Amino acid sequence: MEIGGLVYLILIITIINLSFGETNNYCKIKCRKGIHTLCKFGTSMKPNCGRNVVKAYGLTNDEKNEILKRHNDFRQNVAKGLETRGKPGPQPPAKNMNVLVWNDELAKIAQTWANQCDFNHDDCRNTAKYQVGQNIAISSTTATQFDRPSKLIKQWEDEVTEFNYKVGLQNSNFRKVGHYTQMVWGKTKEIGCGSIKYIEDNWYTHYLVCNYGPGGNDFNQPIYERK
C-alpha cells in the first residue's frame, strides 16, 4: 500500500508470539560480512550492558505504535511534498512511498542487537525474505526519565536539512543523511525495532535500533520515485 493518495491507513500492531529461531537457521543466512546477530547471540533476549543498571528492554505496544506512526507520518509528509527542509528544499513529492507495517522478525533481530549495548551497526541482520537496512539512535538525559522513541527518531528526520535531492545518496554524504534516506526509502515495506533503557552514572540512556525490509540506501539510486 502506498502513501500519497487520499486514504492514509494507520495499521494497528498485532503482536504474534513466534519463535523465529525454530523456523530459520540464521547461521546459514549470508551477508556481506560477519555472522548473523541471531546466530552470534542467540535468542535469549537477555541484555548484556556490563555494569549499567538496565531498567527496561523491549518495546511496549504503545511504543511500537508510536514508532510506526512516526515513520508513516513522516513518509506521508515527504510523499506529499510537504517537507520544506533540505539543501535545497522542499523535498520533491513521491509516488511510490509504501506504508510501513510492523515485522516481528525484524524486531527480534533489532532487540537482540540493542541488548548488546554496542552503538555500532551489527554486521549481519538479513532474513530469508529481505536484505535488511538499519537505523540506530541513542539519547542520554539527567532528567530522571527516558526519552520517548519519537525524540530519537527525530534525530533521523532532521538529517533532511543536509540532503540535496539533486545529488541523491552518495558515499560522500551517507554519514550525514543516511538515517533520513532509510526512513523515506520508497520501496521499504516493513519495520521492526528494539530498545533498551539503562542508567549509567545518573544518565538515563535510551538506545533504539530499527531494522527495515527491504533495506534501502543504495548509492546512486533514487530514494523514491518522484511525481
Swiss-Prot record:
Q: Where would one find the signal peptide in this protein?
A: 1-23
The protein's location, in the record's own words, is: Secreted
Please name the Pfam families in this protein's record. CAP (PF00188)
Q: In which tissues is it expressed?
A: Expressed by the venom gland.
| Keyword field | Allergen, Disulfide bond, Secreted, Signal
Record bears the keyword Magnesium: no
**Disulphide bridges in this chain?**
C27-C39, C31-C124, C49-C117, C193-C210
The record's annotation in InterPro entries points to: Allrgn_V5/Tpx1_CS, CAP_dom, CAP_sf, CRISP-related, V5_allergen-like
Alphabetical GO CC annotations of the entry are: extracellular region
Chain ranges of the SCP domain: 68-212
Superkingdom of source: Eukaryota
Keyword presence, Membrane: no
Alphabetized CDD domains for the sequence:
CAP_euk
Q: Family per UniProt?
A: Belongs to the CRISP family. Venom allergen 5-like subfamily.
- What is the name attached to this protein's record? Venom allergen 5.01
User: What's the source species for this entry?
Assistant: Dolichovespula maculata
Q: What is the lineage of its organism?
A: Eukaryota, Metazoa, Ecdysozoa, Arthropoda, Hexapoda
